[in-house]
Regions:
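N-terminal cap/lid segment of alpha/beta-hydrolase-fold proteins
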Residues: 4-57
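Mobile cap/lid helix-loop segments that gate and shape the active-site cleft of serine hydrolases
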Residues: 33-37, 166-201, 207
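Short beta-strand element of the alpha/beta-hydrolase
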Residues: 60-68
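Catalytic nucleophile-loop/oxyanion-hole region of alpha/beta-hydrolase
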Residues: 75-84, 95-131, 254-262
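Primarily recognizes the serine-hydrolase "nucleophile elbow" in alpha/beta-hydrolase
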Residues: 115-179, 193-194
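Short beta-strand/loop motif that positions the catalytic acidic residue
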Residues: 211-213, 217
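Conserved alpha/beta-hydrolase "acid-adjacent" motif
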Residues: 218-227
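C-terminal catalytic histidine-bearing segment of alpha/beta-hydrolase fold enzymes
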Residues: 226-276
Length: 276
């Protein structure tokens, strides 16, 4: 059983420590260096955690959300816990992952995400979620992590995925250079590039997918999402793909994003339409 850091009453956040002793792979960041600020920006994570925001009237669905931050840090508020209320309102339990950065160890973020899925599965009864209705999602680099888990699942294969302005590929031509360099290093092998280029790993087994992105994203080229969309369609994967004309990158962090309410409505309608 996972170690519960703050066992609080139902419908209040519950935080789990991901690893009881030590993680399989260290990212080389010493304990005690973690920093955070009032915006929810977190850096130097060495002890990853999973914080669950249970729905008061749960439908059984849970979404594991991986905040973005370019594989350097985590936007844990705006791309994490801020989504709890709209999801809880439709019965979806939100779980926000505070994952470790690679720091030269590309396998580390995926290890944390796989472990988080195992915890949600193990604690499903207590959290009132259906093990068959656990999905994964993320924003920006967190979207890359989510899609990577879909491409290379562990013991628990997510039932669906939700991606906001995601990094999808490690192809140098149209990847996000910062995320690529921090995940794979300056001179990654072709095998490593291929492994982490998620548009190359779509199959008929890929679960239903929701993607929301802006056409004028200056940080992550739109081709990340359009190539992924084409691969999903080619493999007959149900996909809901939303491209907004403006918004740039990171608009979950922008309360003035013109399509913010529309995005949340489209997401919640999609989740409900799939019985989630």
């Amino acid at each position: 059983m996972a170690q519960v850091i703050n066992p609080i009453s139902a419908a209040e956040p519950i935080t789990y420590k991901l690893w009881q002793n030590s993680a399989p792979t260290s990212n080389g960041i010493a304990k005690g260096l973690e920093q955070s600020d009032s915006t929810g920006w977190i850096t130097f994570v060495s002890e990853p955690e999973l914080t669950v925001y249970p729905a008061t009237q749960p439908s059984g669905t849970a979404l594991l959300l991986c905040p973005g931050g370019g594989y350097f840090g985590l936007s844990s508020l705006y791309e994490g816990s801020a989504l709890a209320q709209p999801l809880n309102e439709i019965g979806v339990t939100l779980a926000v992952l505070k994952y470790r950065m690679p720091n030269g160890h590309h396998e580390v973020p995926r290890e944390d995400a796989l472990r988080a899925l195992e915890i949600l599965n193990d604690e499903a009864s207590e959290l009132k979620i259906d093990p068959e209705k656990i999905g994964i999602g993320g924003a920006s680099a967190g979207g890359h992590l989510a899609a990577t888990v879909i491409s290379h699942p562990g013991k628990i294969a997510p039932a669906f995925q939700v991606l906001f302005y995601p990094v999808i590929t490690m192809n140098e031509e149209f990847s996000h250079s910062g995320s690529r360099n921090l995940l794979l290093g300056d001179k990654p092998s072709e095998n490593l590039i291929e492994y982490f280029s998620n548009e190359l790993h779509v199959s008929s087994e890929t679960p239903p997918t929701f993607i929301a992105v802006s056409q004028n994203d200056p940080a992550v080229p739109l081709r990340n999402s359009t190539d992924y969309f084409r691969a999903l369609v080619a493999n007959n994967v149900p996909v809901s793909f939303h491209v907004y004309p403006t918004g740039g990158h990171g608009w979950l962090c922008n309360p003035d994003f013109a399509y913010r309410n529309q995005t949340l409505t489209e997401l919640t309608n999609w989740l409900v339409s799939f019985g989630r």
